[in-house]
C-alpha cells in the first residue's frame, strides 16, 4: 500500500531504498484500507473460526493499528471468532494476555513461534491461558527449494503431544511451491502423522494437560476422567503410571486397538504398592516405537 511506511521499516521491501526516505505517506489511509479488508473477510465468507494478525513490531503495535476499534469490529461481525495476540506483540512476546491488566486487543491465545515453552501459560490467578506453538516443517515459513532440513514425523508427533500435555496447541506450517504443490517431503511427513493420528487422535483432540508429574518415559494428556499415558520409551520391570493409585483405575487399554492391559501384580513390583505398573508388550519393543 502506498501509505505504508517503507524506508527504515523492518519488513517493507523498500526499507533500505534511499529513494523512499523522504516519501510522504498518510498511515491513516493504510489503516482505513486494512480495516476495510478485515471487514470484507468477516462479512463475505461465512462463519470464521479464527483471525490471525501477524504481527506487531517496533512502533507498529497496539493502538498504532487502531487495535481496539479493529477488534470491536471483528467481534461484532464474528462473535464466536478466536483472535491471536499479535496486535500487540510478535512471535517472541506474550502480550498483556498473561498480565493482570489485559488490553482490549490482547487476543484469546499466546502464540510462541519456533519454540515450545517449558510449561504452559497461566494468569496471575493460576488459570490456564490458551496458547499455540507456531512451528515450521523445515526452517522456512514459505517454500524454499534448498531447505531440506525437515523435522521427522516422529519428532513432530512427540512435540504435538508435548504441546497438548501443556494445555497448548500446535500450528504446523506447510509451504507450497509457486504452483500450489506441497513438497514431497512434507507429504511424506504428513502421511506418517496422519497414520499415527488415525489410531491415537482421541489422546489429542479435546485433550489438555493434567496436574500429575511428567512421566520419565513420555507425557500425559487428559480428557475429563480419562488419562492418556504417552509411552515413548519402554521400561525394565514394567512401565510405571505415575500419579495414580490402583483403586482409581477403572480400566487400562491401548488406545490404538482397545487391548485391555492388566496392572502388573508380581514379585518385581510388590514393594511399590503406591505405583501402578503395566506391561504393554511381551518384548522390549513397544507396540508403537514413536508413542504408544
Model regions and ranges:
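Mature catalytic domains of secreted/periplasmic carbohydrate-active enzymes
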Residues: 1-292
Amino acid at each position: 500500500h502506498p501509505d505504508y511506511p517503507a524506508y527504515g521499516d523492518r519488513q517493507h521491501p523498500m526499507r533500505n531504498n534511499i529513494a523512499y526516505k523522504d516519501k510522504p505517506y498518510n498511515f491513516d489511509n493504510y489503516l482505513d484500507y486494512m480495516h476495510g479488508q478485515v471487514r470484507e473477510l468477516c462479512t463475505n465468507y461465512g462463519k470464521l473460526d479464527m483471525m490471525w494478525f501477524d504481527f506487531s513490531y517496533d512502533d507498529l503495535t497496539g493502538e498504532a493499528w487502531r487495535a481496539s476499534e479493529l477488534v470491536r469490529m471483528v467481534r461484532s461481525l464474528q462473535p464466536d471468532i478466536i483472535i491471536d495476540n499479535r496486535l500487540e506483540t510478535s512471535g517472541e512476546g506474550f502480550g498483556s494476555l498473561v498480565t493482570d491488566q489485559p488490553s482490549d486487543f490482547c487476543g484469546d491465545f499466546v502464540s510462541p513461534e519456533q519454540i515450545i515453552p517449558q510449561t504452559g501459560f497461566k494468569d496471575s490467578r493460576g488459570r490456564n491461558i490458551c496458547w499455540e506453538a507456531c512451528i515450521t516443517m523445515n526452517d522456512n515459513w514459505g517454500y524454499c527449494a534448498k531447505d531440506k532440513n525437515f523435522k521427522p514425523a516422529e519428532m513432530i508427533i512427540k512435540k504435538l503431544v508435548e504441546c497438548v500435555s501443556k494445555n497448548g496447541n500446535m500450528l504446523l506450517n506447510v509451504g507450497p511451491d509457486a504452483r500450489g504443490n506441497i513438497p514431497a517431503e512434507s507429504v511424506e511427513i504428513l502421511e506418517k502423522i496422519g497414520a499415527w493420528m488415525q489410531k491415537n487422535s482421541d489422546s489429542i483432540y479435546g485433550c489438555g494437560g493434567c496436574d500429575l508429574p511428567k512421566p520419565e518415559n513420555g507425557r500425559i494428556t487428559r480428557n475429563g476422567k480419562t488419562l492418556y499415558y504417552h509411552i515413548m520409551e519402554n521400561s525394565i520391570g514394567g512401565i510405571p503410571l505415575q500419579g495414580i493409585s490402583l483403586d482409581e483405575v477403572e480400566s487400562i487399554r491401548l488406545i490404538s486397538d482397545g487391548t485391555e492391559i492388566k496392572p502388573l501384580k508380581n514379585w518385581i513390583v510388590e514393594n511399590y504398592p503406591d505405583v501402578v505398573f503395566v506391561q504393554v508388550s511381551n518384548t522390549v519393543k513397544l507396540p508403537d516405537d514413536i508413542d504408544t
